[in-house]
């Protein structure tokens, strides 16, 4: 099927300023995840996945530990999730996920990014129906039948499974994340996941070209500069 999920390893920050932003975003997400689901990764699979991802993206251990210690202590900021949808340059579809302690500020900041790119921020549900909310796992392997059988035996609802270039990619509904990860860890003897995330995967792609490409890249850069923005999903193809 060749679903166009976003492997954020490819766009890992390169400069110190960009790294600082990445660390800040991870710190906020780890703190929020640990505070809501518990600080023990063995009992909080979402936290375990997040910590694995942070380590792969070379987030320093002291940044990770500080966020967990902060969650242990209670108190602190209360971050809420916020999600914004709309149409970006070239009429591509965009979803912006945020963690914020001030929703009014965050909405204003995100809307400004849309306006500067001559894009249109919409109401809830504007483009969401054109994305699948998926758990995605990518790991080394070539026996997709054995993987599929193990997932079915674990009563996991598999949306899709692909095998290409010595890697297997598994898609499940986001609600199946925990069961799927446990089953995959068992059948692969704890293989390392190249991708282990919950994402919004577009059902179709929108081709953009010409000036729209430059505007779109600036649009993504503006969103990435916002501390409250955690993830941006889109269906632009160029």
Curated annotation (Swiss-Prot):
Protein name: Probable transcriptional regulatory protein Sde_1551
KW Cell membrane (keyword) present: no
Record-level Gene Ontology MF annotations: DNA binding
This protein's UniProt keywords: Cytoplasm, DNA-binding, Transcription, Transcription regulation
GO biological process: regulation of DNA-templated transcription
Recorded GO CC terms: cytosol
Major site of localization recorded for this protein: cytoplasm
Family the UniProt entry places it in: Belongs to the TACO1 family.
Cross-referenced HAMAP family: Transcrip_reg_TACO1 (MF_00693)
InterPro entries: Integrase-like_N, TACO1_YebC-like_2nd/3rd_dom, TACO1_YebC_N, Transcrip_reg_TACO1-like, Transcrip_reg_TACO1-like_dom3, YebC-like
One family name in Pfam for this protein: TACO1_YebC_N
Subcellular location: Cytoplasm
